[in-house]
Amino acid sequence: MGSVTSNQQPLIVAVCGDSGSGKTTLTDGMVRVFGQERVAHICLDDYHTFDRATRLRTGITALHPAANNIALMTEHLRCLARGESIIKPVYDHKTGTFANPEVLRPADIIIVHGLHPLYNEELRNLAHVHIYLDPEIALLQQWKIMRDSTVRGYTVEQVRQQMAIRRRDSRLFIQPQKQFADIIIRFSRGSLYYRTRDLAHLDVRLIEAKDAPKIDLSDVVEASKNGDRPALRLLEQEYAGEPRDVLEIDGTISHQKACELEDVIWAHMDTVSHLRPDCLSQLGLFYAGNILRQSDPLALTQLIVLYHVVNKMHEAASEETL
């Protein structure tokens, strides 16, 4: 049925993380910039094997691989990578049940996010960019309670109970996928958050894998300097026993400075400059409960991830012309 809109093989971006870690928020910004017509967007929750009532009755959590049709998600990702349409299942989080299947057509960019996109070697090999979201645990809990109690029909106490039940499966099946990520993104509460309790001003660390393709952000870091403490810092730190490049985004960054840095980052992506929205207006959007907010640290994080994706697109195009 459908086919990709160019002769180039689709680029697949896998975004992994625990429940409530911000996967949808991160990927929604990417879709808004690239455009719905260029992106096939898949939430792997659609591949749950059991509905909510069955999981509660049997005690199996959605984090357990046995509660997900990993074979089908792998086959569907293979089809999309070949430029073929799929008929995919649909899981409705509001009801905890399955809706009617839907057709998903391939596109230039395929964004797949969920609990298990890096779970096995075949899934990892299908994806070109691997991202793991790893917010500090207190934030993860806050985000999950806020989301599930406002839009997914749970009470706060039910969410707390579910988090306790899921802790073991997270440790066994979700967190080990972190080791396969090209970029680990960690949101944390910094000085401005503690003064204001404002989720729009979180600190962010982007930790690159040792063998991940490098992109040059030295001019972005230089442009971020404003007095003694730059808004962005590029460091080499030990992570999991290995030296890693770490980009830190300070939650205190001003909107004006964030827009200035946006200019510098977009200058690296001249081949897709036509996609550029107004100053961060399509990026950094997140829901605090039912209220739509905007965060400059989140916007810059999404833009840097976009830069990685565009860089990988250029690499793939160069390889195909050889």
Task: Annotate the PLM regions.
Residues 3, 147-322:
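C-terminal accessory "lid"/substrate-recognition subdomains
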Residues 3-10:
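Phosphate-binding P-loop
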Residues 12-14:
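Short hydrophobic/aromatic beta-strand immediately N-terminal to the Walker A/P-loop
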Residues 19:
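The conserved Walker
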Residues 23:
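Conserved lysine of the Walker
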Residues 26, 30:
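Hydrophobic positions on the alpha1 helix immediately C-terminal to the Walker A/P-loop
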Residues 36-43, 49-98, 109:
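Conserved nucleotide-sensing/catalytic segment adjacent to the nucleotide-binding pocket
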Residues 101-149:
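ATP-dependent NMP and nucleoside kinases share a basic, alpha-helical "lid"
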